[in-house]
Amino acid sequence: MWLTKSQFAARSAVSLVGTMKDPSDALELLSSRVDQLEKRVYALEHASEAAAPVQEKLFGPAGLATDEIPEVEASGVFPVLGKGLLGVAGAYILRALAESSSLPRSAVAAVAVAYAMAWLVWASRPKVSARFAQLVYSGTSAVILAPMLWELTLHFKTFSPWTSAGILGVYAVLAALLFWKRDVAPVVWIGHCSAALVALSLGIATHALIPFIAVLLLLVSLWEYLAMRGRGGATRHVVVLVCDVAIWGLIFIYSGPANARADYPHLGMAALIGPGCLLWAINGGALAGEVLCLRKTISVFEAIQAVAAFALAVSGVQYFAPNSGAVVLGIACLILASGSYVALFLRILPSENRRNRTVFGFWSAALTLAGVAWTLPPAAAAACLGAGALVAIVIGVRRDIAMLELHGLLFLVAAALISKAPEYAFEELAGSVVAKPGLMLIAAGVCSVLFYAASKERPGERWPLQILHLIPALLAAFALAALIVQGLLGLAAFAVNLGVHHVALIRTFTLCAISAAFAFGGSRWGRLEMTRIAYATLAFVAAKLLFEDLRHGRMEFIAGSIFLFALTLIVVPRLVRMGARVQR
């Protein structure tokens, strides 16, 4: 049996009184013992008060057991799931009514569509604040809509493909509006993902791709707008990828033989080209708005998607309108390239955003190359690209913009390939003698020489930039060598009847002269790439002696070629040292 404080104190006092013979001593001991008990009681009471907030913080408010909390949460999950299942049960009732024909099927279909959208609206109510409930109710809406549209379109034939596509479009817009107004993310996640997948599935099943591609383009437009307003997400990636797949399927199916798509409806050129071009316009316009107006950084997904959309647009034009469509697309590329360069200089380069600068620089160069190639004939294209290369290298060197120097190199290489300058140079130096070079080849060679003369190697450059200087130097060297060989052969034709051995000796002389000149000039002007080309030319001459002079030449001409090569081997290192001394 437990004793109270007063009983314990009384018994202690009695025992003390009983043991003490002097009453005054007993009173003193009793008083001290009572003081000690009061201090202990005070310490215990204040210790419990200090521990109470800690205990409340750890275990919750008083009167609430910790094992009751999971029961409360679990009790909220099961009613939500039950309500969702009730919604699915209602959908089955509507399905039974549609199959029984007791009511007009169109009326039942309209009620079913409204029923699915009502669940989407219910998921966005302010009272439904739990994320789990929003997910369940939005999922219930998608579970009702997807099979309902599938059966009403394919089984009952109540809806045409265009009607089903229109319903999906309204559903997508409703989800976007609810997300925008009430900021309920699960509504737009589930609503748009389900709408995109249902559109792709119905397009494949009905063979009517255009209506459902239109829905997918609407979804892409909605998400591009949401992304510009700072509300993008992973659902945007899903929607865009599904749209890419649908447009690629359209191009793949209709680019094949006609007998392989007998079940598909006939489509005109605009319907076949339009989806890819619209997707490219949507992605490109949104990308430009985000970068130029909102000053955002381009994401990796946006950069890759822009390339994919451009590839789809080009594929559609090349398959279904290779002539007139290519010219229109080329003009559009040139207009966009001009705007891209203006934006690059006025807005992007001053901001020093490296990724935006790289992406816009790549797009500017790519659009320029594509526009020139699709719009102009080969001779005019080569001339324009050569002139553009010279302009780019001059501006890039003066303003110290390495990206423009790279663009100039790309334009120069493209001009050389269009004019077939590398092929002509190889034939002149190692193959069969070709006819006299045309104006286009001469212009390409002159552009290569001027480009290399205008370029400037900076001290301490890394090897990628050194390669950028080496390529125009190679083009200039081989263009000069080919033109010199052609000129010497023309002069020699006045004196002798040219044979293979004459051609081999003239080629050897020209290459040795180019090697010696580049060796001295490279060390004299501090152009390391010229010195490298000088030694590379010696290796080329050695291979030429083995495969041409020794096989087709006469003894005296072989001796002359070997003499020239040996002399060049001796002279080139000395010229390098001589040029270095002159430079100092």
Description of each model-found segment:
Residues 2-584:
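Alpha-helical multi-pass membrane segments and their bilayer interfacial helix-loop junctions
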